[in-house]
Amino acid sequence: MKTKLITREGYNKLKQEHDYLWNEKRPEITKIVTWAASLGDRSENADYTFNKRLLRQIDRRVRFLRKFLPEVTIVDYSPQQEGKVFFGAWVEIENEAGDVKKFRIVGPEEIYGDAKDYISIDSPMARAMLKKQVDEEFTVRTPEGDKEWFINSIEYNKQSAES
């Protein structure tokens, strides 16, 4: 089961997406569908078929967002988190080979588009490093075996609590 946590920034992005889809994109596509339908035969009408499919995708996403947003818990930065890895942290880690990675621990629904530097709180990597401090070592179980990592730095977006 996915964790129903989200950062303030993630919530705002999803709310903004909902508002854009509902107030701008859906009315625009509805007009196109209405126009294409008025042309007559819909069986070979590419404009109608394509935009009707797009309208269904928009409606599906809007339904999901309307159900998801009220159920989610927004997690803002708290000074008690400082110095340890918790939800919303930007963490830089390094392994013994010197490979360095930096990412943010977020809710599963925040990982979309080109958010390659986000990992889910539900991931084995995030779970393994929770509550760890800088210079601590942690182990992640992978199909190839256990992997050792060291925490180089931990940062939080402190302004998110003020937004």
UniProtKB/Swiss-Prot annotation:
GO terms for biological process: DNA-templated transcription elongation; regulation of DNA-templated transcription elongation. InterPro entries: GreA/GreB_C_sf, TF_GreA/GreB_CS, Tscrpt_elong_fac_GreA/B, Tscrpt_elong_fac_GreA/B_C, Tscrpt_elong_fac_GreA/B_fam, Tscrpt_elong_fac_GreA/B_N, Tscrpt_elong_fac_GreA/B_N_sf, Tscrpt_elong_fac_GreB. Keywords: DNA-binding, Transcription, Transcription regulation. GO terms for molecular function: DNA binding; RNA polymerase binding. Necessary for efficient RNA polymerase transcription elongation past template-encoded arresting sites. The arresting sites in DNA have the property of trapping a certain fraction of elongating RNA polymerases that pass through, resulting in locked ternary complexes. Cleavage of the nascent transcript by cleavage factors such as GreA or GreB allows the resumption of elongation from the new 3'terminus. GreB releases sequences of up to 9 nucleotides in length. Belongs to the GreA/GreB family. GreB subfamily. This is Transcription elongation factor GreB. The gene is greB.
